[in-house]
Amino acid sequence: MRKLSTVAAVGMTLLCLVKVSAQDEKIGLSRDYDVCMDKSGGVTANMLDCIGAETKRQDARLNKIYKDVMAHADEAGKKRLLEAQRAWIKFRDADVDFYRDPNGGTAATLAGSDRYLMMTAERAAELEKFKE
């Protein structure tokens, strides 16, 4: 059963990697990421490099928007955002851990790294809505 869940998770991630362009714009992934993934040739190590570079960009984006939202929130809002962010981090880490099944090999590493990136970009996009 565990093997089946790993195969399903990896398969879904690889399918998602193929269909990134529309989602990229929606969640704010950089054009550099698209170019890098296009040039990766489907080689896992190259794809992981692309994901790693984009994750750094998205982590910085998330940290910036989080600070901006906190700076404009009242005390009650700051407390709610802090609690929500802590809960989100806990969920993200558990979810990524599921994708990084140790029995899944390099594909699971790719799936976990991609999941972390996508969740980070999605969270940044969610918080950016509070600035509008």
Language-model regions, residue ranges each:
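Bacterial N-terminal signal peptides that target proteins for export
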Residues: 1-8
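N-terminal alpha-helical modules
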Residues: 20-132
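Bacterial N-terminal signal peptides
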Residues: 8-16
